[in-house]
Amino acid sequence: MKSITLLQKAYGAYRGRLLETIRSEVSDMVAELDAQIVSIGTDKKNRIIVKINGEDEEFVTNALAKEYGRSLKSDSLVPNKAYPGQLIDVGKVGYGLYSDLGVTDSNRMDALIPLHRLREQLNISSPLRTISDAFVLVDYLPVVVNITNIDLYNERVEAELDQSTLTRISNWIKDDHERLLVFGANQSQIEGSLKKANHREDIYEIEQLGKFEFSLRCKRSTHASGILAAIGPRLKGVPMHLFIPKELKAKQNATT
């Protein structure tokens, strides 16, 4: 039997449904193979664990790693390399942001993006809470970070935002479309909620940031707050965040 801990997480009010989404996709993957799903669950940090049995178990776990990302061991981290992750515990400390890189052999190896480096990269000199608010840096937001320092003895990793993430933030702020970020739901849930609320036509594009993390790019005539009011009650407990360029620019200009 092979067990793989994926980088992708299942969390929030619809954790069970997200796991069923993964189960369905894995079932399709193994349908023509000599492999069976033994179990699908999560660890303490909500990372998805899939156990596979059969002659093709090695092939399946490798395919899962390619599709959803594989968790890491701390000694496999390399400086000056980019790693995908998700922001966690935003607002709990004032000295920086943490990104969960999927390290499974230590609970302390989340990558710290220090406040001073965030200020340099985002060109803003405000406290962390203000920066997080002005750029919508929130829990579960998928980001890519570059590791700048690793201290395995003290279990510390420092990083900076990768250029790909900085470019995404910049492009969103320059865009004249408002966005609603929706985390912890699958695409069919989001599509269904929009259709039931008669707002599917108000969304220009549904951008997938992670497996269960989406950006709803509204049409120019549509306010993201209206979409939030319409689908929020249909997806109770799902984290949603407004990304309104005009308001964010005002916050950034007020604090630089």
Task: Please give the residue ranges for each predicted region.
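OB-fold/S1-family RNA-binding modules
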Residues: 1-68, 131-256
